[in-house]
């Protein structure tokens, strides 16, 4: 029963993340042209599954980047396997056998509002130029 629905949930999460990346790309937060022929660094606060990586790869698949680096403080064993398959380099401080969700590993689980995140990303992009 659990395995049956697990795949469905993962697929639905991937679809939602894919839609989110398409919307962010359309809104011009990070234009694809700015990533061409550059090193792309994907950073996550923790990776319990490969859904975020799969979604990022969907966004990046039409971009000819030079190198892909994935960095995270911790990830599950299966996710690290996926990282090795898709990235040129990985930086993962801890590989966790029984991953319990990202929030479990942080004392402060405050997530900034979406507008603050977008503003921060836009400021970073402006500094690239």
Where are these regions (language model features)?
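PRPP-associated nucleotide enzymes
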Residues: 1-129
């Amino acid at each position: 029963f659990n395995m049956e629905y697990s795949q469905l949930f993962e697929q639905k999460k991937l679809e939602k993340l894919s839609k989110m990346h398409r919307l962010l790309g359309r809104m011009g937060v990070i234009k694809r042209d700015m990533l061409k022929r550059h090193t792309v660094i994907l950073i996550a606060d923790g990776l319990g599954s490969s859904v975020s990586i799969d979604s990022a790869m969907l966004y990046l698949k039409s971009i000819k980047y030079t190198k892909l680096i994935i960095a995270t403080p911790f990830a599950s064993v299966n996710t690290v396997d996926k990282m090795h398959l898709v990235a040129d380099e990985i930086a993962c401080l801890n590989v966790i056998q029984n991953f319990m969700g990202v929030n479990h590993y942080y004392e402060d689980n405050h997530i900034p509002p979406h507008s603050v995140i977008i503003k921060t990303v836009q400021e970073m992009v402006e500094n690239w130029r």
